[in-house]
Amino acid sequence: MKVVKRSGDVVEMLFDKVTKRISKLNCEPEFTKLNVQPDKVAQKVFTSMYDGISTSEIDNLTAEVAISMITENPDYEVLAMRITVSNIQKTCPKCFSDAMLALHARGVVSDEFMKYIKLEMDGWIKHSRDYDFGYFGVKTLQKGYLNEFETPQYM
């Protein structure tokens, strides 16, 4: 089965890659370890995958599978949130001012605001704070409020 990466490269999908992504979001030093089973989530995700699926779609599918497992353990909600936030962060510029420049180019952000951003705001952003939301809060922001270049903190 082939997967389309964010870069546009097409690669072979391996079960271990899905498991590794889930495990990483469970075991990173900045995160509290969750009582979840990455293999079990990955198995459910793998059964719903199709040839040509994008890595972003895999993340969305993985989050949906994790949230469906919330009745087994509430930690699956936290895992779903981490997957969703990580996916959002991967699609947005790493720097707040770069995200605002992209929005400025589309007429969403004013010239005055851009001047202020360059002077003050980049240092205020801590990407780890994006993970302070719950899954449903992140999904609400993603579907109703965030522009394509924004993480929850950029809003």
Where are these regions (language model features)?
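Extended catalytic cores of very large enzyme megasubunits
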Residues: M1-M155
